[in-house]
Amino acid sequence: MTEVIDGNAVASDIRDDLTDAIATLADAGARPGLATVLMGDDPASETYVNMKQRDCEEVGIESYHVDVDGDAPPETLYDEIAALNQNDDVHGYIVQAPVPDHVDYREVIRRVDPQKDVDGFHPENVGRLVAGDARFRPCTPHGVQKLLEAADIDTEGKDVTIVGRSDIVGKPLANLLIQKADDGNATVTVCHSRTENLAAKTRRADIVVAAAGAPELVDGSMIGEGSVVIDVGVNRVDADNEKGYELVGDVEYESATQNASAITPVPGGVGPMTRAMLLYNTVKAASLQEDIDVALP
């Protein structure tokens, strides 16, 4: 029978463990602070930002928010970033993507203080990750590692196929899994839209991570017997229901369970972990900036 890896439960445990670290910092006068920056009025982005603010409130992290008009020049956003870089109450912040077309997101990330870059996207933090000295692991890849750990799935010596090469998931996860570490030591294949014979590469993997942003791209015929399947994708597809849509992953769930030994659902798998690891990185940022040691889960 296929094990369903419950991301909600694992994320809840991590949040519970973080509350002790947050209390330690708060008692020392250094309550962690996380800011979100939203440029424009994208409905999905507004939803994500609201969820992150609620997460902060639940664990005792101070939450700050900055709205920037979507028609404002890039310099307006840059000024807000500069102010956050100088704000000692804000230990970490994120600039919610996507930004409007007239703003270069890479330039936005370059302007973020690397010590407050709790997304882990700044070039300095990317370099540290590749070198095996990560300050902040990007939230989704770190969440995937924590899910595997919680399910007692060892990556050492395993063949891992990652479907997707994004800067947010595919690339950093590959770099994390090849590190000489207890949650690494894997042999990793990264596939993408130009990969030939994708199914052959996924079928031979011990662990398949689907992170291509393509609804139900990976089906059961592409999963080897006994493989572990981590579905990072969250896609809206049309459906005959009250909402008019449903959420599906990058994996065709029902057929994949015929072969997989373990699988993450959508929703309720990787998504909650991404949010939990943002809290984790914020607490770590506060610990580093305030020079106060705390135990992290």
Swiss-Prot record:
What Enzyme Commission number(s) appear in the record?
1.5.1.5, 3.5.4.9
Spell out the reaction equation it catalyses.
(6R)-5,10-methylene-5,6,7,8-tetrahydrofolate + NADP(+) = (6R)-5,10-methenyltetrahydrofolate + NADPH; (6R)-5,10-methenyltetrahydrofolate + H2O = (6R)-10-formyltetrahydrofolate + H(+)
- Please name the pathway: One-carbon metabolism; tetrahydrofolate interconversion
Give residues annotated as binding NADP(+).
164-166, 193, 234
CDD domains referenced in this protein's UniProt entry, alphabetically: NAD_bind_m-THF_DH_Cyclohyd
> Its GO biological process terms?
L-histidine biosynthetic process; methionine biosynthetic process; purine nucleotide biosynthetic process; tetrahydrofolate interconversion
* A cellular component annotation (GO) from this entry: cytosol
The answer to whether keyword Metal-binding applies is: no
Q: Which UniProt keywords apply?
A: Amino-acid biosynthesis, Histidine biosynthesis, Hydrolase, Methionine biosynthesis, Multifunctional enzyme, NADP, One-carbon metabolism, Oxidoreductase, Purine biosynthesis
Drop me one GO molecular function for this one.
methylenetetrahydrofolate dehydrogenase (NADP+) activity
Annotated InterPro entries? Aminoacid_DH-like_N_sf, NAD(P)-bd_dom_sf, THF_DH/CycHdrlase, THF_DH/CycHdrlase_cat_dom, THF_DH/CycHdrlase_NAD-bd_dom
Is Membrane set as a keyword in this record?
A: no
Q: Subunit details for this protein?
A: Homodimer.
Q: Which family does it belong to?
A: Belongs to the tetrahydrofolate dehydrogenase/cyclohydrolase family.
Q: What does this protein do?
A: Catalyzes the oxidation of 5,10-methylenetetrahydrofolate to 5,10-methenyltetrahydrofolate and then the hydrolysis of 5,10-methenyltetrahydrofolate to 10-formyltetrahydrofolate.
Q: What is this protein called?
A: Bifunctional protein FolD
Source organism of the structure: Natronomonas pharaonis (strain ATCC 35678 / DSM 2160 / CIP 103997 / JCM 8858 / NBRC 14720 / NCIMB 2260 / Gabara)
